[in-house]
Amino acid sequence: MGKDYYKILGIPSGANEDEIKKAYRKMALKYHPDKNKEPNAEEKFKEIAEAYDVLSDPKKRGLYDQYGEEGLKTGGGTSGGSSGSFHYTFHGDPHATFASFFGGSNPFDIFFASSRSTRPFSGFDPDDMDVDEDEDPFGAFGRFGFNGLSRGPRRAPEPLYPRRKVQDPPVVHELRVSLEEIYHGSTKRMKITRRRLNPDGRTVRTEDKILHIVIKRGWKEGTKITFPKEGDATPDNIPADIVFVLKDKPHAHFRRDGTNVLYSALISLKEALCGCTVNIPTIDGRVIPLPCNDVIKPGTVKRLRGEGLPFPKVPTQRGDLIVEFKVRFPDRLTPQTRQILKQHLPCS
């Protein structure tokens, strides 16, 4: 014998749409597994969802009224009746039906939610709520207390509002880049693993995603690249933003100062005094000969204009390559060398 959907919801076969909704609301709250701990509550909750799924749809209800459960699910009556090619199968997730009806996956948050939002909760109308003295759907809260408060006398429910979701704080990662990547621009691929909501709105799955991070020419250290709402998702939150913050990698030859590039050139005392030509490497792989005809003191700076990093807002323009000289002094001198230096070097 097939299921009696009307009996499951506790309504007559001639019930109208509003009566079906009221019956489902009452029965679903009564047998929701989060509230009802009886062994058969889960199965009863599923039957209630299936009954509502059929009776709330005029086409399904019409077939059910004519052919019963078996005819509804096989596409027609057993004695040659016809209902076209329609075959009904319950989707199997009573929680999805509950979430669709009440507008949220948490069954009871909606009844105790914050009133900060000005939009009324779409699935709940206080005027439609049936509260039987012997079958209060919130009875479990009365027996065990709610937030440490004893339950007072019953009263009609007040207008309720959904809890406003709050976005999680940003998830910040350091992204180390080379000066060559800043000079040329680059794209990095970063794989992240995060939790995402399933279609039922209450369970989550883990999935990987590749984020393509475009690094533009000349971007400064500390620049932030944000991927909105790519963090973990749960039924109660807004996913966090994923933020990458640029950090310069240490370089074998150069240091960065804004759009300028600093290079330390080490020369001998002889080269510093007598002159020399120093080969200066550039960020793009070239070598520039730098003549030094004057005396070079420790800390002397020479500037090669336009050989630095691109300006972030005007990549066709570049900063400078700044050469800082260091002079390597000998560890010891022979007496003869000392005498020669005394004769030829000025006293001041």
Curated annotation (Swiss-Prot):
SMART domains: DnaJ (SM00271)
Alphabetical UniProt keywords: Chaperone
Superkingdom assignment: Eukaryota
Residues passing through the membrane, by range: none
One GO CC term on file: cytosol
GO function terms (MF aspect): protein-folding chaperone binding; unfolded protein binding
Induction (UniProt): Expressed under normal conditions, its expression can further be increased after various stress treatments.
Cited PROSITE patterns: DNAJ_1 (PS00636), DNAJ_2 (PS50076)
InterPro entries reported in the protein's UniProt record: DnaJ_C (IPR002939), DnaJ_domain (IPR001623), DnaJ_domain_CS (IPR018253), DnaJ_subfamily_B (IPR051339), HSP40/DnaJ_pept-bd (IPR008971), J_dom_sf (IPR036869)
GO biological process: chaperone cofactor-dependent protein refolding; negative regulation of transcription by RNA polymerase II; response to unfolded protein
SUPFAM superfamilies: Chaperone J-domain (SSF46565), HSP40/DnaJ peptide-binding domain (SSF49493)
J domain ranges (all copies): 4-68
The protein, known as: DnaJ homolog subfamily B member 5
Gene giving rise to this polypeptide: DNAJB5
